[in-house]
Amino acid sequence: MESFFNNTFATLIAYIGIIFTYLLVIPLLLFYWMNNRWNIMGKFERLGIYGLVFLFFPGLILFSPFLNLRLKGSGKG
């Protein structure tokens, strides 16, 4: 078991998992949450979301060119 913890491969897998979670998984969940709750959030929920946006900013920047969070208009004119 000790050789597993000293293994470079295990360390590499751990780093990849952390980076994958930080840059891909949590920012996508955050985008989904903001898109669904933007108009009905309370002040403490909004404060928490702003804190998470600050914390996961690099991942949000990666997805920002591809996601559209603009409000849907009435469709007129």
Swiss-Prot record:
Its main location: membrane. The chain crosses the membrane at residues 12-32, 47-67. The keyword Membrane applies. One of its GO terms (molecular function) is oxidoreductase activity, acting on NAD(P)H, quinone or similar compound as acceptor. Keywords: Membrane, NAD, NADP, Plastoquinone, Quinone, Thylakoid, Translocase, Transmembrane, Transmembrane helix, Transport. Its EC number is 7.1.1.-. Disulfide bonds: none annotated. It is a multi-pass membrane protein. It catalyses: a plastoquinone + NADH + (n+1) H(+)(in) = a plastoquinol + NAD(+) + n H(+)(out); a plastoquinone + NADPH + (n+1) H(+)(in) = a plastoquinol + NADP(+) + n H(+)(out). It comes from the Bacteria. It is an enzyme of class 7 (translocase). NDH-1 can be composed of about 15 different subunits; different subcomplexes with different compositions have been identified which probably have different functions. NDH-1 shuttles electrons from an unknown electron donor, via FMN and iron-sulfur (Fe-S) centers, to quinones in the respiratory and/or the photosynthetic chain. The immediate electron acceptor for the enzyme in this species is believed to be plastoquinone. Couples the redox reaction to proton translocation, and thus conserves the redox energy in a proton gradient. Cyanobacterial NDH-1 also plays a role in inorganic carbon-concentration. Belongs to the complex I NdhL subunit family. HAMAP family: NDH1_NDH1L. This is NAD(P)H-quinone oxidoreductase subunit L. It comes from Prochlorococcus marinus (strain AS9601).
